[in-house]
Amino acid sequence: MEGSGEQPGPQPQHPGDHRIRDGDFVVLKREDVFKAVQVQRRKKVTFEKQWFYLDNVIGHSYGTAFEVTSGGSLQPKKKREEPTAETKEAGTDNRNIVDDGKSQKLTQDDIKALKDKGIKGEEIVQQLIENSTTFRDKTEFAQDKYIKKKKKKYEAIITVVKPSTRILSIMYYAREPGKINHMRYDTLAQMLTLGNIRAGNKMIVMETCAGLVLGAMMERMGGFGSIIQLYPGGGPVRAATACFGFPKSFLSGLYEFPLNKVDSLLHGTFSAKMLSSEPKDSALVEESNGTLEEKQASEQENEDSMAEAPESNHPEDQETMETISQDPEHKGPKERGSKKDYIQEKQRRQEEQRKRHLEAAALLSERNADGLIVASRFHPTPLLLSLLDFVAPSRPFVVYCQYKEPLLECYTKLRERGGVINLRLSETWLRNYQVLPDRSHPKLLMSGGGGYLLSGFTVAMDNLKADTSLKSNASTLESHETEEPAAKKRKCPESDS
C-alpha cells in the first residue's frame, strides 16, 4: 500500500474531456447494437452494414446523435418535434386489416431510387407512411410500432458515447459472449461490489475475459492503488481494457506477473533469472493488445490476432519495409539499420517488462493484498487455493465461473482448508422490462443465465496452528464431557437391634 501511495494520481478532468478528440476510444451505438472504435481522421468504419468516416464527430460532445449521409459523412441530427396526440389519425381496431402485400404503393425500386438521390431516411419513412393505404386504419400502438420498425430499417442514426464498464460489458455480452466467458453485465457489477473494489486498494486479478474485468476494476479505482494481473501464456490479453481509453496515469499502478511463476513465489524459490526463461514475445503481445485498428476493422474480429508481430499493427511501417524490400537500390545499410533499431527497441521493451515483473513479484511477496478477483476459463479450485496466500486477513475474494459444479467443488475444498468465512455461492437473476405508456411488461426474451459467483472473506489461521495449548484444552474439554461421574454409594440407615 505504501508503494501505491507514492505514485501520482490521475489529473482532474477538464471541460474538454467531455468532447470527442482525435485518437479517443469511443463506442458507436445504433438502437441496441454497440461497437468500440478509435477516432481517426479519414478512417473508414463499417458498422451495421454501413460505412462512414468519423472526421465530423471530432469536437462534438459525447452522446451526440449523427446521421449517415451520402459519401459516408456524419452530420449531427437535428431534433424533430413529435406529432401531438390531437394531430394523429388512428383507428380503433386492427381486425379488418388484411396483410396482402398490396397496402404499400412504393416498390423496392422506388425506395432504392430515393436512396440514390440522397434523400434522408427520415423523409423515406414519411413517404412510406403517406403511401400506405392501411396506416390510418391501424391503432395508435400499431402505428408507433410501424414507424419504429421503418426507422430502424431506413434511418441510420449513430450515437457516439463514452466507453464505460456498463456499455462495454453489454457490447461484449451481446456480440461476443464467448470472449468474456458468458459473463453478464449484472454479474460483473456484483463482482465489483463483493470484491470491495475502491480507490487505494491493492488488488490481485486473474481473468481471461479479454481484459474486461481488469478495465472495470481500473475504472472503479480511478487510477489510485495498484492492480497485479496474473496471466497465462505469453502475455496478458487487454483488448477490452484498451477500449476504455484510460490515460497513462492509470497504467502506472498496473502490474503483470506470469501465472506459471506463482508456485515458485509461494515456495520462496523465485529469482530474477527465472524471468529470462520466459518467451520473448510477451512484450509484443502487450503492444498488439493495445492497438485496436486491426482487431476491429471487420465484424468478424478474431482474438488470435493479438499474437501478431508489431509491424502488422503499424500500416505505415509495414508499407515502408515492403518498399525497401522490393527496391534493390534501398537494400544494404538502411535495411540493416532498421533491423538494428527494431532489435534495440525490442530489447528495451523486454527489459522494461522484466522490471515490471520484478516489481509485481515484490508486491505479491508482501502477501497483504486487499482483495482477489478470479474470472477465468480454467478450473477455479487450484487457482484460488494458490492465490489466497497472497491476500491479507479480513479481505474479500470473488470467483466467477460460467458453471455451478466447479464452484461447488471449490466451496468444498475451501471448507476443508479453512482460513475463510462467509462463503456464499450465488447467481444473479435478470429480466428486462419494456416501459411505455399503457404497454409496460416484461420482455418476452431474457437471458438464461449470467454465470455463478463464489465469494467470501479471508481470516488468519496461523495462530490456531501454532498454539498447541488450544488443541490440548479442547481435547481436555472433550474428555470431561464424555466421562461419566462415578455412581455414589447409598448410605444404609442403621437399625436398632
Curated annotation (Swiss-Prot):
GO terms for molecular function: RNA binding. It is found in: Nucleus. Keywords: Nucleus, Phosphoprotein, tRNA processing. The keyword tRNA processing applies. GO terms for cellular component: nucleoplasm; nucleus; tRNA (m1A) methyltransferase complex. The modification Phosphoserine is found at S298, S305. InterPro entries: TRM6. The keyword Electron transport does not apply. GO terms for biological process: mRNA processing; tRNA methylation. Residues 79-100, 327-354, 478-497 have a biased composition (Basic and acidic residues). Its main location: nucleus. It holds the Pfam family Gcd10p. Substrate-binding subunit of tRNA (adenine-N(1)-)-methyltransferase, which catalyzes the formation of N(1)-methyladenine at position 58 (m1A58) in initiator methionyl-tRNA. Together with the TRMT61A catalytic subunit, part of a mRNA N(1)-methyltransferase complex that mediates methylation of adenosine residues at the N(1) position of a small subset of mRNAs: N(1) methylation takes place in tRNA T-loop-like structures of mRNAs and is only present at low stoichiometries. PANTHER family: TRANSLATION INITIATION FACTOR EIF3-RELATED (PTHR12945), TRNA (ADENINE(58)-N(1))-METHYLTRANSFERASE NON-CATALYTIC SUBUNIT TRM6 (PTHR12945:SF0). Belongs to the TRM6/GCD10 family. This is tRNA (adenine(58)-N(1))-methyltransferase non-catalytic subunit TRM6. It comes from Homo sapiens.
